Structures are given as C-alpha cells and as structure tokens.
C-alpha cells in the first residue's frame, strides 16, 4: 500500500518516483513506491534496518535496476540516461567513505568530472574552492583524503557531490559518523544549500529528530514493503509507531517537534 502523490503539473526540479518495485531474486523488497522530492527542500527516507532504504536510494541513483517503475526529473527518464548525463543531474553520497590516496582538493575536483573532457577549466577550480570554503574545510585542501576519519571523509564526499552542481542530491546517512556539532552544522548547511540552489535533497536517516528539524517531507518504510510519503509537519504518532514497531510520541518544544520512543 502506498500513498499516491496528487496528480497535476509538477513544479520544476521535482524528482518523481512512480510505481517503483525491487526484488532480490524471488524476494520482493517493496513494490508500487510513489513519492516526490521537491526542489529547494529536503526529504528523508526513514525506517528500521532491512526495510530497503539504501536499496531505494541506489535504484534512484541508477546503481541498481528496479524491477518496475520509473524515476523522472522534469519529465526526463533518469534511468534511461547515460552515466555522464545522470551525473550532471544527480549526485550521490554513499554511506561509507572510501578514497584513494589523493588530496582532499583533488577528491572534490572529481565532482566536476561530468563537465570536462581532457582537463578541468578555471571555472571547475573556482567551484571546488568555493565549495570547500562554504563547507568550512578549505584548510583540508592539501590533506591526504585516505587519512581522514570517517566523519571528515563524509564531509569531503558531501563537498564532492555539491561540486557536481546537481539538481538532485542523494545522501545515505550523511551524519552517521559525525559528532554532535558537525552533525548539526552539516544538516543546517544541507537545508540552506537546498533552498539557496533550488536542489531537491533526498536523504536516508536513522535520526528522526534531525529529519523533523530539516525536512519538509518524510518517506516512511517498514519490513512488509509498505511505503508512504507524508509532510514532516503532519506526520503522526501512529505513522511513526508503525514505521519503527515501537510506541512513538511526538512532542513540541519551542516550536520544534521531536519524538520520544517507548511507553
């Protein structure tokens, strides 16, 4: 069962997922998944381990092939594009950070690869330097990326994705390895970046409270393949309790909603 988005013309920059299905062999992970991620806002995919959140992200990114359904951006079939064409539209930050022994600067410069042929242009270098500065990691430029901690590496990979200048940014648990201060700083940056640049951000998260703070919409999953999309400010105790299989209570403090789990 899936909540169907409303019919009608979609705003520019909308990532549209329709009737998506995926299976490992004979085991259907989920089917008939429908939701939208809108330009200028952040949407979170929530749920317990094993519900297919990362698999859903990989299907949208074109890494895995869905059994059925479509992924479109401004009417274009994302899954039918070449890898280079897709990289100009969608940037993906995976859950695990892996890097060769190259500088942080050169790692971020790889985000410009879809745009240059033989070598980078002055504009490519300018974008890299601006991105490093905006994320507060310009001082890391000459560091060996392979020596970074997990949290530092995630910030560098986020910088590389932003340097791609995508229309859609996919983030798989972008704050999993970050300390509290870096987590807050990164999420606020992502929200501001989405709004400023008109990018649709879709992220997998295990942090419900963080999702409630920065996201406009939530995509809720469960082990039985049930997926629904709901506005973050309209999600209910019952919906979150069903998603996580535990009693969840929503509370408000200083105009911020947060969850308490358990009876």
Regions found by a protein language model. Give the residues of each.
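Conserved structural motif at the start of ABC-family nucleotide-binding domains
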Residues: 15, 29-32
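The feature captures the beta-strand-to-loop junction immediately N-terminal to the Walker
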Residues: 46-48
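Conserved ABC ATPase signature
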Residues: 144-148, 152
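Helix-to-loop junction immediately C-terminal to a conserved catalytic motif
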Residues: 61
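Conserved ABC ATPase "signature" region
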Residues: 123-140
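Conserved ABC transporter NBD signature motif
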Residues: 69-77, 86
């Amino acid at each position: 069962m899936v909540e169907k988005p409303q019919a009608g013309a979609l705003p520019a920059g909308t990532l549209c997922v329709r009737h998506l299905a995926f299976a490992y062999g004979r085991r259907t992970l989920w089917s008939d998944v429908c939701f939208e991620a809108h330009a200028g806002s952040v949407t979170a995919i929530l749920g317990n381990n094993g519900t297919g959140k990362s698999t859903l992200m990989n299907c949208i990114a074109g890494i895995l092939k869905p059994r059925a359904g479509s992924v479109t951006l401004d009417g274009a079939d994302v899954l039918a594009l070449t890898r280079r064409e897709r990289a100009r539209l969608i940037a993906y930050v995976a859950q695990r950070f892996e890097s060769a022994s190259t500088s942080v600067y050169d790692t971020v410069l790889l985000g410009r690869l879809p745009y240059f042929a033989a070598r980078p242009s002055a504009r490519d270098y300018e974008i890299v330097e601006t991105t490093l500065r905006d994320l507060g990691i310009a001082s890391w430029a000459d560091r060996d990326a392979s020596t970074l901690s997990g949290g530092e590496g995630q910030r560098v990979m986020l910088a590389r994705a932003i340097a791609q200048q995508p229309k859609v940014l996919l983030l798989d648990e972008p704050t999993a390895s970050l300390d509290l201060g870096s987590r807050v700083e990164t999420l606020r940056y992502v929200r501001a970046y989405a709004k400023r640049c008109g990018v649709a951000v879709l992220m997998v998260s295990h942090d419900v409270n963080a999702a409630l703070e920065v996201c406009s919409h939530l995509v809720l999953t469960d082990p039985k393949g049930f997926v629904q999309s709901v506005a973050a400010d309209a999600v209910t105790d019952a919906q979150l309790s069903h998603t996580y299989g535990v009693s969840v209570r929503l509370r408000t403090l200083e105009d911020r909603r947060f969850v308490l789990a358990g009876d």
